[in-house]
């Protein structure tokens, strides 16, 4: 026989076997060459058996084995009145392009429409799990079930119904990636089925995912563990007296640009719970187009487990139409933009809410912290630009069972140091605020800023005298102390009238009169003051050897002189308006101007005391030299110059 005729007969026989209508289980051997094989006639399984079993060549993948169900074709698993309905399609390592309808068979428990592992499914029409017929304890079949599945859904996937049992899931299994542009729905039953259920799920939703209707309990739209959900559509719990959740499970990460809703309860005029986090480490990122209807709940922590949730409002998301319930031992962290809950916030025993100053302000109708619950406040804000920061606010009040359970932590603060921040309820008990203790008038007023090495704190609000009779630890209400090896920046014009003492680290002045009306400016050994180009006026300067006063293009006016044993550096001007400034430090790197005004006195004893500075003298300049001194500084003005000491002056 001619070779070409034999090939043609072989192809015709394959085409006939694929195109013929069959009843009973059929097996299709896919070719493994990446060329799709088509099903053009309907197939129905019998006696609870699968309609279509897929066989593939050894060591081939789903990308090489492709099966297409053509338009108007029905593939349905066999019915069983005593057992499980048959699968519509069963196999491994293949791709299914569905343009028809694939059904699981009806049975005591409904059959799965498409069952197997390592499958890729492109669904352009309908997939139906089989219906359960067994009554109590039975269930509808899943639309899709297996492990290592990729689902691109453009039309509809349904779990099977079971009027006496539980509806089937639309999609179930582990290691499943879903891109949904159509609808995925759990089946109906006494308890509704879940839309998608499983573990290690990666879901992108651009349309609708819903739990099934339940006579008692609606199904969850998405449930399981290790779930990532990027939602741009609607994810909705199933209807029922107890409605299902939009999302339920543990280790869940949600990016929400769409609608997440629990069932709307018309009798209560409110939504049932939208999201339940049952354990693990969870996150919820909400955006301006986010809609959440119903409460967000964290279950009590599992035995030997954890339950943490990070809620981040990325860009001013709309209000959450529900509350926040934090179960025993669980923790919530809120950050980003302000978060508004139209319901209530409740924090149970050993649970915690974690907030950051200058970050999210959380608002709710009522906020209740039960006994042994905790508020952990991160006060590590680097730029303090408000008199106070609101952390929590409430329409009807904030109830805190134990104020000692408001705990502050601050990575800018030297370990073990007294905090410069105080967090408490306001007088009306409807706001929790953090403020600088400098401004506290209820016994916690405090003026020391102890900044950790390599840390920087900028104070951008004006500091005035605290006149309260109730201050902390002997503070006078008007003196500022900088301690710790880090950096403090004063970037506002201040009005305090006490002393400024830099014990260690660096104090940077970033505004005119940042030192207020300082009486005495003290610089201890190892401390530095950087004037950073701004003018300051104080009464008296007292610097220890080993300190640095960096004029840095600024101007410092001394109304009552002082003693400078430390280093003066940079350029700019140091003006002595009154009293005597006695300089004994090494200032060879100072290239600015000393101005001695009428009635004032500048005393130096070596060339290094003046550095390379100009001296504009209208008062008295005393050069007390004990050794030979070659004076190279330019001296101007009409003041007196006095030479004392045994050294020669040239």
For the regions a protein language model found, what residue spans apply to each?
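Glycine-centered low-complexity coil/loop motifs and glycine-rich tracts
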Residues: 42-51, 72-88, 99-113, 124-145, ...
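Asparagine/serine/threonine-enriched low-complexity, disordered tracts
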Residues: 53, 65, 69-74, 93, ...
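Tight coil/turn sites that cap or link beta-strands
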Residues: 38-40, 49, 59, 70-72, ...
């Amino acid at each position: 026989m001619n070779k070409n005729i034999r090939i043609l007969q072989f192809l015709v026989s394959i085409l006939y076997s694929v195109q013929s209508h069959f009843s009973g289980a059929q097996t299709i051997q896919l070719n493994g060459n990446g060329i799709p094989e088509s099903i053009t006639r309907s197939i129905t399984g019998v006696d609870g058996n699968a309609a279509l079993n897929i066989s593939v060549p050894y060591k081939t993948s789903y990308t090489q084995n492709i099966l297409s169900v053509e338009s108007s074709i029905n593939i349905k698993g066999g019915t069983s009145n005593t057992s499980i309905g048959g699968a519509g399609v069963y196999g491994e390592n293949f791709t299914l392009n569905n343009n028809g309808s694939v059904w699981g068979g009806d049975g005591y428990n409904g059959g799965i429409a498409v069952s197997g592992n390592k499958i890729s499914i492109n669904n352009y029409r309908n997939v139906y799990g089989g219906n359960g017929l067994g009554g109590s304890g039975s269930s509808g079949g899943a639309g899709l079930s297996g492990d290592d599945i990729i689902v691109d859904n453009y039309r509809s996937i349904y779990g099977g119904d079971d009027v006496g049992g539980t509806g089937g899931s639309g999609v179930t299994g582990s290691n499943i990636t879903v891109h949904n542009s159509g609808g995925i729905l759990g089946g109906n039953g006494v308890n509704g089925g879940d839309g998608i259920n499983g573990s290690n799920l990666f879901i992108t939703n651009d349309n609708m995912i819903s739990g099934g209707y339940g006579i008692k309990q609606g199904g969850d739209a998405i449930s399981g563990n290790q779930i990532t959900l990027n939602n741009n559509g609607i994810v909705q719990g199933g209807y029922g007296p107890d409605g299902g959740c939009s999302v339920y499970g543990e280790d869940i990460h949600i990016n929400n640009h769409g609608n997440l809703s629990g069932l709307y309860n018309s009798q209560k005029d409110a939504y049932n719970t939208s999201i339940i986090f049952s354990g693990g480490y969870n996150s919820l990122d909400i955006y301006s187009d986010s809609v959440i209807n119903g409460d967000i709940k964290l279950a009590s922590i599992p035995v030997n487990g954890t339950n943490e949730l990070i809620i981040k409002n990325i860009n001013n998301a709309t209000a959450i139409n529900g509350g926040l319930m934090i179960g025993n031992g669980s923790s919530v962290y809120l950050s980003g933009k302000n978060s508004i809950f139209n319901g209530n916030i409740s924090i149970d025993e050993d649970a915690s809410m974690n907030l950051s100053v200058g970050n999210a302000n959380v608002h709710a109708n009522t906020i209740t912290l039960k006994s042994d619950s905790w508020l952990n406040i991160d006060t590590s804000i680097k730029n303090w630009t408000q008199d106070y920061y609101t952390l929590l606010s409430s329409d009807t009040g904030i109830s805190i069972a134990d104020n000692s359970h408001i705990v502050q932590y601050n990575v800018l603060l030297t370990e073990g140091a007294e905090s410069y921040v105080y967090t408490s309820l306001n007088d009306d008990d409807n706001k929790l605020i953090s403020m600088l203790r400098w401004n506290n008038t209820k016994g916690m007023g405090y003026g020391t800023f102890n900044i950790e090495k390599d840390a920087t704190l900028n104070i951008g609000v004006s500091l005035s005298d605290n006149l309260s009779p109730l201050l902390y630890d002997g503070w006078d209400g008007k003196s500022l102390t900088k301690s710790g090896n880090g950096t403090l920046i004063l970037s506002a014009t201040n009005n305090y009238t006490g002393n400024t003492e830099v014990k260690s680290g660096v104090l940077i002045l970033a505004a005119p009169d940042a030192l207020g009306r300082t009486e005495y400016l003290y610089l201890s050994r190892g401390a530095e003051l950087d004037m950073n180009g701004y003018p300051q006026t104080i009464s008296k300067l007292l610097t220890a050897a080993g300190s640095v006063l960096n004029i840095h293009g600024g101007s410092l006016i001394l109304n009552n002189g002082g003693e400078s044993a430390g280093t003066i550096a940079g350029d700019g001007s140091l003006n002595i308006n009154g009293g005597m400034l006695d300089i004994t430090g090494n200032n060879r790197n100072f290239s600015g101007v000393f101005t001695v005004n009428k009635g004032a006195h500048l005393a130096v004893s070596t060339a290094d005391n003046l550095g390379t500075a100009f001296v504009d003298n209208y008062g008295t300049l005393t050069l007390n030299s004990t050794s030979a001194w070659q004076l190279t500084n330019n001296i101007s003005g009409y003041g007196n110059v006095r030479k004392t000491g045994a050294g020669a002056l040239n």
